[in-house]
Amino acid sequence: LGDVYKRQGDKVLVHGGGRSATKLAAQLGIESKMVNGRRITDAETLKVVTMVYGGLVNKNIVAGLQALGVNALGLTGADMNLMRSDKRPVAEVDYGFVGDVKEVNADLLASLIHQGIVPVLAPLTHDKQGHMLNTNADTIAGEAAKALAKHFEVTLMFCFEKKGVLLDENDDESVIPEIDRIAFKGYVEQGIIQGGMIPKLENAYQAIDAGVKQVIITQASEIHQGKGTRVF
């Protein structure tokens, strides 16, 4: 959190919490089911992720930021109708109570930012029919960035365990400094970029198409330096 705090300018923080959700589910005797790295969210699992993402993880992050003097506010998509989703239709896989974002209250987010508040968004949305929906954190970040691009000059930063997109997954120092669309296509065809990094970069280009200035993929510890892979 200290590294996030050091990052200059207005901020919105989006977090995950999958490992904590898996741990609590196991303690409660609820099996965690994953397909292609995505969680199957049945009714019992939805209760777990709502508790963990919207409660435990979110409020601990808010408390940590407050300790640093950051006026943070923890939110889910249901709060003040911040982010509405439709339940994902069943195709090859039934992901259960998983949401695809359809509407973002950009004016609300912009208002909070103008008040000097740092919104901390949990990866949960709602369908406006009384149901919470588990929603991918990268998607939440991308949708928030696209919505805020109408109000601000936005840089979207995806943080994960590596220093950026790697040329060699076994070499943590082989960070690709910049990737344009042509290079992205080539890296995918060569198998250099694969798995979960593909949708992350697809989200990045969707954000750029919607007016986001730039996207950076990096480690949390380097977020304040702007290091990593710049996507354009």
PLM region spans:
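C-terminal catalytic "cap/lid" subdomain
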Residues: 3-232
